[in-house]
Regions:
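Alpha-helix initiation and N-capping motif
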Residues: 151-154, 234-237, 241, 309, ...
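Transmembrane and membrane-interface helices of multi-pass
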Residues: 2-231
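A diffuse structural propensity rather than consistent per-protein peaks
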Residues: 8, 137, 141-147, 169, ...
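Solvent-exposed soluble domains appended to multi-pass membrane proteins
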Residues: 268-280, 290, 295-649
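N-terminal leader/auxiliary helical segments
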Residues: 3-52, 174-182, 195-196, 205-209, ...
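Extended hydrophobic/aromatic-rich secondary-structure runs
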Residues: 52-60, 237, 241, 245-265, ...
């Protein structure tokens, strides 16, 4: 082996180009100037390097060393990019080793298709770092990490990406510079495996062994999706691999046709006994799922210069009002839609999955199908692009008769970049006024006005609300948006108070916003880390109400969850409950709230993980999971009693 330094003019030109790039990065991020100088010297020396390998055994050994060493380096660079020093220190040694094996699997898989080890290293390293970079920005934007199910949501993410600011920190800059040096160095070492077939066999064999070992070592390890737990508990690459594993749904314990049959016998009645409201005619039912609408006081107390939602707070007559658990935080709105409409729960699906893009292929039983079966016209409204979360395909599959997206709204009525709640509500009123005589109408609307992020300033939005004491610009913008939503809500309720026909309005938030971590720390003293189960569930709590323009009992609901709201809406509307909703109504008495993180235990007076349930609580949860699996995944043996709509198509 011969190693030489050849100082050529072309290397100076390459150095100048590299330094211009590094200088731009320096002024963007601002890191120590000695890093810039060190990069320049290192880059010039590497480009001047000449390496000759004459011995085939030396080439083989060096090739193996490059693949193994590069896997170690890349795995650590991924962790360095995503986590600060404190969080990086939390990962267990065996988990870091598994992340290195994940990298090695990628390197060896690429090597199967190339003869050149250097090319393999460049392709693999750059692919993994770009992949980590995607997660870096996804976490900045929504407060959760990028996992396997997000691959189906790329188009939706890109559609709102322009509303976010792409910012690099110093760690990201160092990773970019180090990757540039790594690529330059690897290009200087020319190692090829001549016996390509044998090389492919060895690589595939090692990949299989690595995958088997990773699978064995991670049995019982859960996919973490909260904040950065995936990266500092499992390591990001391993956590992503776990999310792939969790995309396959297993039959629940105790699942059988006999259990389904027993439940069918119990809930085959007409559901009239569950009706608690005498309504002369079917009411118009309007649902408003308000984007990022939340009551942040459930997380902790804070003061503002004026009341944020005075009208919402004033509603007291003919209303059921309270708080509900959502299964998502900061993103993945369609999961909240799905829980509300179907009565199903994300509790039994993989962490981070998006039902609209993974599990809806046939028309599911839902409030849409239930109302269509009794003659309602079902309308969906969403003032944004129809392709978001594949709604253009999902809504017709759900059974909606009409769908209205961004082109059906006045696109001059914007707050920031999104169509206002006021415009959405005016469209609801317009559709109501155009309904035919004796037409029963159901409208499912999803607003867009309050969508994150909340850092950019807009000339068309005067922020009226600000927090007192420590002030955070994103929190102020978010609270000001809620204030505008409150004004629009007053318009909607006031209009339907004046109509003669019965009307029911169901209103709830889809999830809490993702705001500055320090703002949350000011609310609960901890921020987003180190929370108890009760404190964590506070971050998944959203307000809701079911209001009618006719006389109904006023009720305060301390806690429920989105999967129960459609059942509660049917009960309050005086509509006989279908069998599945009968089951949910009974279950709610024992399990008042359930979501992707756990459930509220009445017997214990606190939130618990599903696996910690005992006694009657465990029995209800098990039956719920069995019915949901039968509904979603056992199409051949699907219950005709609980899920008749699919059978009648």
């Amino acid at each position: 082996m011969k190693i030489r330094l050849n100082f050529e003019k072309t290397n100076l030109i390459r150095l100048i180009v590299a330094m211009i790039f590094a200088a731009v990065l320096y002024f963007k991020v601002t890191f120590p100037v000695y890093v810039l100088a060190g990069f320049g010297v290192s880059y010039f020396l590497i480009k001047s390097l000449s390496v000759e390998l004459n011995n085939k055994w030396l080439r083989l050994a060096l090739g193996i060393l490059m693949l193994g060493g590069s896997s170690v380096m890349t795995a650590h660079m991924v962790q360095y990019l995503l986590l600060d020093a404190e969080l990086r220190a939390r990962i267990m040694g065996n988990k870091m080793f598994l992340n290195i094996l994940c990298c090695l699997v990628v390197y060896l898989a690429v090597q199967v298709f190339t003869k050149n080890v250097g090319l393999t290293c460049i392709i693999s390293h750059m692919a993994l770092m770009i992949f980590a970079g995607i997660n870096y920005f996804v976490y900045l934007f929504r407060g959760n990490e990028f996992i396997f199910s997000d691959l189906r949501s790329i188009s939706t993410g890109l559609s709102v990406a322009g509303n976010y600011e792409f910012v690099l920190d110093d760690r990201a800059a160092y990773v970019v510079l180090l990757s540039a040096l790594y690529v330059a160095f690897v290009r200087k070492i020319h190692v090829t495996f001549e016996k390509r077939l044998w090389m492919a066999v060895v690589c595939i064999s090692v990949v299989i062994c690595c995958c088997a070992y990773i699978g064995t070592e991670t049995e019982g390890t859960v996919t973490e999706t909260w904040e950065q737990k995936g990266s500092y508990r499992n390591g990001y690459l391993l956590n992503f691999a776990l999310s792939v594993r969790d995309s396959f749904i297993a039959e629940p314990d105790g699942y059988s046709e006999e259990v389904i049959s027993e439940l069918e016998d119990q809930y085959s009645g007409d559901g009239e006994s569950y009706v608690n409201q005498d309504v002369e005619k079917n009411p118009t039912i309007i649902v408003v799922m308000s984007e990022s609408y939340a009551d942040l006081s459930v997380v902790g107390d804070f003061l503002t210069n004026e009341q944020v939602t005075p009208y919402y707070d004033s509603l007291q007559d003919n209303i059921m009002k309270g708080h509900a658990l959502s299964s998502v935080f900061g993103a993945k709105t369609p999961n909240s839609e799905w829980e509300f409409m179907t009565g199903n729960s994300m509790a039994f699906l993989p962490s981070g999955s998006v039902v609209y893009q993974q599990y809806i292929s046939d028309t599911p039983t839902s409030i849409v199908s239930n109302l269509k079966n009794i003659g309602y016209t079902c309308v969906a409204m969403h003032p944004y692009y129809e392709t978001g979360w594949s709604r253009n395909a999902v809504y017709p599959t759900m059974g909606f008769d009409e769908t209205h997206f961004i082109d059906d709204f006045d696109q001059t009525k914007l707050l920031r970049k999104y169509i206002t709640d006021q415009e959405l509500y005016e469209s609801i009123v317009e559709r109501y006024e155009s309904k035919k005589a004796n037409e029963d109408l159901f409208i499912m609307s999803i607003s867009m006005q309050n969508h994150g992020g909340y850092t950019e300033k807009y000339p068309n939005f005067n922020e009226q609300i600000r927090t007192l004491g420590a002030s955070y610009s994103d929190a102020n913008q978010y609270l000001s948006l809620l204030h505008e939503s409150d004004k629009a809500l007053e318009y909607l309720i006031s209009y339907f108070q004046s109509v003669d026909d019965p009307v029911e309005i169901v209103f709830f938030g889809d999830h809490q916003p993702s705001l500055n971590t320090n703002f949350y720390k000011g609310l609960n003293g901890k921020g987003l880390s180190g929370l108890t189960e009760d404190e964590l569930e506070n971050l998944y709590t959203v307000p809701f109400f079911i209001w009618t323009n006719y006389e109904t009992e006023t009720e305060e609901v301390p806690i429920t969850s989105l999967n129960y709201l459609s059942t509660m809406a049917l009960e309050r509307a005086g509509i006989a409950l279908p069998s599945y909703n009968q089951f949910l109504a009974d279950m709610q008495e024992t399990i008042p709230a359930i979501n992707s993180r756990g459930y509220y235990s009445v017997s214990s007076g606190c939130f618990k993980h599903l696996e910690d349930a005992t006694g009657e609580e465990a029995e209800w949860i098990d039956r719920y999971q069995i019915l949901q699996y039968n509904n979603m995944f056992d199409k051949k043996k699907q219950s005709k009693v609980f899920f008749p709509y699919l059978q009648n198509q």
